[in-house]
C-alpha cells in the first residue's frame, strides 16, 4: 500500500511546501535517492534571494525552507558544489533576509505581516538541522506565543501583525499537525542537554492532550478540531499517529498513547484507494473541503516510516 501512496505522491503537482514535505517523507522512509532528486529539483528552482522550490510569483517565506533538511542531506551525501551552494543560500535567506516581526518571528509571506501555524514545520527543522538550534527555538517560541489559544489548548491558524488580531482563530487540525510534527523533528535534532528541548516536549504533549478528546469513534478528526460541524478528514490522524510513534520511540511520550495512534492510522489506511491516493484529507488546492493533497500522501509515508522505526 505504501508503495502505491509513494507513486501517487510523485505523480502529483506540488507547490514549494509540498515539494519539501515530499522530500522529507522519502528521506525519513529511507528512500535516499528519491529524497536527493526532490531536493535537487528544489535547488534547480531556487530564486535569486535563496528561496527554494520557487514556482511562479510565490511570495512565501517559510514554505521554501520545507525542503531544507533534505537539501542538507543531499549536499552532504553527494558533495555536489551546486547543492552545497543552494543549501547555503537558503540558510542565508532564513537567517538574515526573510521578513520578520519586531520579535524576530519570520512571516509566512513577504507581504501582509502574517504569522501562520504552518511555519512551525516549514522553517525550524531546517534551522535545527543546519545547527542553528537557538534560532530554531526562537522561531518556535515566537509562533507558539502568537498562536496558542489557552481556552482550547490548541493553536490558531493565522495571526496578522498589521491588524493585531487573528485572521483565522480556528484550531485547524492540519495546522496543529504541522506544529506537532515540526516540533517532533526539532526535538530529535536538538542536543539532549539543550535547555529548550523539554519545553518543546511539553508543548507537543499539550497539543496531544487537547486533540485527543476530539478523536471520532473511527479514529478520524474534524477539519477544525473543536468544531463538530466541520468536515471529517484524516490527514491530522496521520500527523497525530506520526507524532505519537516518534515520541514513543524517542522515549518522551508514554506508550499508553499508542492505541490512539493505531486508531488514527486505521482511519487513514481505510481511505487509501486503488491509485494510492489518500482520500478525505483536507484537500488541495483550496484546503476548504475533503479531497486529496500531496501533504496527505507525504504524511501517510511519514506515519508508516515512524511506525516501523
Model-inferred region functions:
Residues 1-20, 27-68, 72-89, 97-101, ...:
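CBM-like carbohydrate-recognition segments
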Residues 45-160, 168-169:
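Extended ligand-binding groove/face enriched in aromatic
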Residues 114-120, 124-223, 230-241, 256-281, ...:
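Extended ligand-binding clefts on enzyme/binding-domain cores
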